[in-house]
């Protein structure tokens, strides 16, 4: 964790190579003349010029100040109150808060030749405002486009079953890939999530039919096991009753009681127990 924080701090302090070279060069005679003229203009137009020269940078912002096209020494500045010269100075504000955007649905051909539609969401923030301004024209647009291509490339190497079961692993791989790719832009990709995986209608029907067939097969197996267990129990009960005349008599009386309680209109002709024992003995 400390290594990540240290690398994050180092990345936030990086400055472009071109800025390092330019910072060593002087403004030149013409440059200093223009700067002096700007100071003179501020003085003669004071206090009106104060409204033009004073800029406020909020807590979640950083500002890059250019003087005659060169980034001022120190790179990004803020938050606080800053003074700029008219005509020679310009500034760009960069929002340092976390930004989220949706990856539009992407048509992806999986490794097992199944076409699916996948979308997601990415969370990122600008970690180095100087790199985000100096190294790329539009860091937000570039990150969005790179997220789309990364999503297609990551899912194109996976089977459908892997995509459906390993979403978190795929999202983590995408986050790592995006973070490395946007490092030179001063962007820190914090999180990537896969929102939805849409399958073709025919494939959905086939998977539903397969699942239904599997459920029916399991139900049949359970029913068959129940019948087999019931048959074993009946066989064991018949053997016990055959060996014990008293048990047969009790079962006989219990059956008569049940019939009399449920169907009062039924006429029962009881048979002698000895006859029943003879019948069961002959069958056995």
Curated annotation (Swiss-Prot):
Membrane topology: Peripheral membrane protein; Lipid-anchor
Intramembrane sequence windows: 32-52
General function of this protein: Regulates ion channel activity and transmembrane ion transport. Regulates ASIC2 and ASIC3 channel activity.
PROSITE patterns: BAND_7 (PS01270)
Impact upon substituting residue 182 to W: Does not abolish interaction with ASIC3, but abolishes regulation of ASIC2 and ASIC3 channel activity
Similarity-based family: Belongs to the band 7/mec-2 family.
Effect seen on changing residue 109 to D: Does not abolish interaction with ASIC3, but abolishes regulation of ASIC3 channel activity
Molecular-function annotations in GO: identical protein binding; ion channel inhibitor activity; protein homodimerization activity; RNA polymerase binding
Record's subunit section: Interacts with LANCL1. Interacts with SLC2A1. Interacts with SLC4A1; this interaction positively regulates SLC4A1 activity. Identified in large complexes with SLC40A1, SLC14A1, SLC29A1 and AQP1. Homodimer and higher order homooligomers. The homodimer is banana-shaped. Interacts with ASIC1, ASIC2 and ASIC3. Interacts with STOML1; may redistribute STOM from the plasma membrane to late endosomes.
SUPFAM superfamilies: Band 7/SPFH domain
Protein name, as recorded: Stomatin
InterPro entries, per the entry: Band-7_stomatin-like, Band_7, Band_7/SPFH_dom_sf, Band_7/stomatin-like_CS, Stomatin_HflK_fam
Gene3D superfamilies tied to this protein: 6.10.250.2090, Band 7 domain
Gene: Stom
GO biological process, one term: positive regulation of viral process
Organism: Mus musculus
Domain of life: Eukaryota
Tissues where the protein occurs: Expressed in all sensory neurons of the dorsal root ganglia. In the CNS, expressed in many neurons of the spinal cord, medulla and pons. Expressed only in scattered neurons in the cortex, hippocampus, thalamus and basal ganglia. In the cerebellum, expressed in all Purkinje cells (at protein level). Widely expressed with high levels in heart, liver, skeletal muscle and testis and low levels in lung, brain and spleen.
Membrane topology (Cytoplasmic): 1-31, 53-284
Record keywords: Cell membrane, Cytoplasm, Cytoplasmic vesicle, Cytoskeleton, Lipoprotein, Membrane, Palmitate, Phosphoprotein
